[in-house]
Amino acid sequence: MKYDGKNAKNGNYVKQDSHNSHSSHSPEDHERLLPPRGDYQTLLSFQKAEVVYDITFRFAHKYLGRGDRTVDQMIQSARSGKKNILEGSKAALTSKETELKLTNVARASLEELLDDYKDYLRARDLPVWDKNSKEALYVRRLGRKTPQTYELYREFMDTRPPEVIANIAICLICQADYLIDQQIKHLEKEFIEQGGLRERMTRVRLAYRNQKQS
């Protein structure tokens, strides 16, 4: 399996064609010890999280007061969401367990950030958009464009009031959460079916031993 940011409906990844095992001549052809992973930058979940970070950094510094601890908290949560997806993708080469753990940390960090944005609106008696409102549906359509970059949303950051920007961030976080949830389900399934590095090492050794005996 390889993650691909262009295929969100399939859980942020696409299935690649496998080699015909009957034509293999070495254990490495049957199973790679370190399976390939796609570039984390192609992950749609990472792209969304990076946009959320860029929006949050600007939002917090522009609309929250100096000395407000929420500034650092929101920026750190946004950064954690982005960085843990990145680090999880890199860790995938050697440890599915670590990849799964870091991806879960990313999910939890974005959930904290989501709560901070909702707190901002609630404390000021400002509405959170209904998920089926025309505004939310517009952001959802914008969220289907690939790649997802801050430039898609820059105009809103420059021209819209803070309550609109906060709601856009909420929409994007919810989209990122959905993608990460699909990613986690895939990782859990992959771990159950294939195990981690230790299991792969065992299978490769057995395949090599069987080949020498045949």
Predicted segment positions?
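Amphipathic alpha-helical assembly/interaction segments
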Residues: 1-214
